[in-house]
Curated annotation (Swiss-Prot):
Extra remark beyond the main annotation: Expressed from antisense transcripts. While mRNA expression levels of HBZ-SI were similar to those of HBZ, HBZ-SI seems slightly more expressed at the protein level ex vivo.
Motif segment (Nuclear localization signal 1): 87-92
Organism from which the protein derives: Human T-cell leukemia virus 1 (strain Japan ATK-1 subtype A) (HTLV-1)
Keywords annotated in UniProt: DNA-binding, Host nucleus, Host-virus interaction
Localization terms from the record: Host nucleus
Protein name: HTLV-1 basic zipper factor
Principal location class: host cell
Residue window of motif Nuclear localization signal 2: 116-120
Sequence motif Nuclear localization signal 3, location on chain: 137-141
Amino acid sequence: MVNFVSAGLFRCLPVSCPEDLLVEELVDGLLSLEEELKDKEEEEAVLDGLLSLEEESRGRLRRGPPGEKAPPRGETHRDRQRRAEEKRKRKKEREKEEEKQTAEYLKRKEEEKARRRRRAEKKAADVARRKQEEQERRERKWRQGAEKAKQHSARKEKMQELGIDGYTRQLEGEVESLEAERRKLLQEKEDLMGEVNYWQGRLEAMWLQ
C-alpha cells in the first residue's frame, strides 16, 4: 500500500506505508519458524537412528552374532578369546560410527545457528539502514520544501515591491547575467581543451622520437 504526501507546491510523492514493513516482518518470522521446524525434524530423525542402532546392538549382544550356535566341542581358550576380541572390535567400531554421526549432527547444528545469526544481524542492519535512509529522505524533502517556500515568498515580496514590469526587467537582467557566465565557462573549457591537446601532441611527438 502506498500513501502520498505533499511536497512543495501541488506535488504529491509516494512514501512507504507502515503496513508494508509489518508484512515484511511477518514473512521473515514465518520463514524462521519453518527453518526451526525442519531443524527439529532432522534432530528427531538422527535421534531415532541412534536409538535404533543402540537397540540393534543390545539385541546382538544378547543373541550373539547371526547364525552363531553353541560353541563346538573341542573349542580352545584361544578361540574364545579371538571371538571375544572380534565382538569388542565390532562394538568399538559401532561406537565410533555413532560418535562420528553425533559430531556431524552437532556440527551441522552449529553451522545452521551461525547462518541464522548472520541472517538476523544482516536483517537488523538492513532495517536500521532503511530507517536511516527514510529519515534522511524526509529531512531532505522538508529542507527542499522549506527552501522552495522561502524562494516563493521572496519572489512574491519582490514582485509586490517592484511591480510586474519591474520584476520582469529584474528577471531578464538575471537571465542575461547567467547567460554571460555560461559563455565565460564555455570559453574557459575550450581554452583548457586546447591546452590539453597541445601537451598531448608534445608527448606524442616525444614518444615518436
